[in-house]
Design a protein with these regions (language model features):
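N-terminal glycine-/serine-/threonine-rich phosphate-binding loop
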Residues: 1-32
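Glycine-rich N-terminal segment of FAD-binding domains in flavoprotein oxidoreductases
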Residues: 26-52
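Short beta-strand segments
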Residues: 33-37, 65, 102-103, 130-133, ...
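A glycine- and small-aliphatic-rich helix-loop capping segment at beta-alpha/alpha-beta transitions
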Residues: 46-57, 80, 144-153, 212-214
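Ligand-binding beta-strand-loop-alpha-helix segment within the catalytic cores
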Residues: 56-128, 251-252
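Glycine-rich phosphate-binding loop
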Residues: 124-150
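Class I SAM-dependent methyltransferase SAM-binding "motif I" and its flanking Rossmann-like core
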Residues: 140-184
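ATP/nucleoside-binding phosphotransfer catalytic cores, i.e., glycine-rich phosphate-binding loops
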Residues: 185, 189-252
Length: 252
């Protein structure tokens, strides 16, 4: 895995957006794997800027999001579809029909999961998958213990994940307890992976991912099995790394 340490969150967003924009420029029909949560917001802001100021063209691209809460309609303000519209889709020229987010309120959730896997496969697979990392090392909503063979499925959210996401809801009781999530196998099927982490609260998970063994107990560590992973962290998220000193030259 390639490690890039940047000064702060602002630099992280710029660096990540640059990598994604390079993919769009080199392959206009790129298939993007996208993430939600707090960390990618800066990257999306920079991508919008690149689209507006440098005419980065998303018109032939397509996207697949990692996950969606079970039970939330696409119109719910805390759905990940609503997040994507607000933070990216409404501001770039990516056609609506080219964007894919799991349907959290589907009548048949198992069929929705199977159809999502089929759609990714029929698109030719994901070219570049953007990930965040949870405090417990989760990627997507693949919580500790997730199988390396897992594909898109309905998952139970852990207490720690529910607590971490409660800040987006009026109360913790409103946070869904299940989600549809791409599996570890689905994520590892992407041609490239870019994982972003910011802040001291992510430092332990980043250390375990990069310096620990590849284990289902830390789902992000399973990325060690992937041939093309770039990890971009700010100095706070890198604060527990013993290898950090060797990567000082990677700062931008």
């Amino acid at each position: 895995m390639k490690l890039i340490i940047v000064k702060d969150y602002g630099e992280l967003g710029k660096k990540a957006a640059g990598l994604v924009a390079d993919e769009v420029k080199s392959n206009p029909k790129v298939v993007l794997g996208l993430a939600t949560g707090g960390t990618p917001v800066g990257m999306y802001r920079e991508l919008i800027k690149l689209h507006q100021e440098e005419s980065i063209d998303f018109s032939q691209a397509s996207s697949f999001n990692l996950d969606e809460y079970v039970g939330l309609a696409a119109t719910h303000p805390q759905s990940y579809r609503a997040y994507m519209q607000e933070n990216l889709f409404d501001h770039i020229n990516l056609p609506a029909g080219h964007t894919h987010v799991p349907t959290g309120d589907a009548a048949d959730l198992q069929q929705e999961c199977a159809s999502y896997e089929t759609a990714i496969r029929e698109a030719g697979g994901i070219d570049i998958q953007v990930l965040g990392i949870g405090n417990n090392g989760h990627i997507g909503f693949n919580e500790p213990g997730s199988s390396v063979e897992s594909t898109t499925r309905v998952v139970q959210l852990t207490e720690s994940t529910i607590e971490a996401n409660a800040r987006y809801f009026a109360s913790i009781e409103e946070v869904p307890t299940q989600a549809i999530s791409m599996g570890i196998k689905t994520i590892l099927g992407a041609k490239k992976v870019v994982l972003l982490a910011s802040g001291e609260t992510k430092a332990e998970a980043v250390r375990l991912m990069l310096e620990g063994e590849a284990t289902a107990d830390v789902p992000a560590s399973l990325l060690q099995h992937h041939p093309d992973v770039t990890v971009i962290v700010d100095e706070a998220a890198a604060s527990q790394l013993t290898v950090a000193a060797a990567n000082k030259e990677d700062k931008r």
